[in-house]
Amino acid sequence: MLSLRALTSDDYQSWKRLWDGYLSFYKTELSDEITANTWRELNDSKSLITGFVAEIDSKVCGIAHCFLRPSTWHPVGYLYLEDLFVDPESRGAGVGRALLNKAAEYGREIGAERLYWITKGDNAQARVLYDSFVKGAATGFIQYEYLL
């Protein structure tokens, strides 16, 4: 059975396995220091970053990390879903959609005006989910990135 909950400090081993899978999927390497800092932030009640896990039959199979960012256009701000990853063995079981719904529910609870995220253009499987979740209402905006 699929269930969702807030990430806790007891989830480290499961989270780390999925986090490593997520980084591998995006062919990204981060230092141990950044990973440790991310974990610390996810477990700090004063942090802006919030984490959720999905479980199937008590096994953690998906993670989502999001944070509220201020906006000049809305008094509360927008909830940014920075990371979403589902164990490949659990894909197709509704885990990704459930995590999106959990993030949206959290955003409504804190008064955010919208939930938003990005994905790679070639992430076809995720894009099918995202397009159906937003009912085809992609923003049409193009993201630019300038490394500092």
Predicted feature locations:
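Helix-loop element at the rim of GNAT/NAT acetyltransferase active sites that forms part
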Residues: 17-30, 72
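Conserved active-site alpha-helix within GNAT-family acetyltransferase domains
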Residues: 97, 121-140
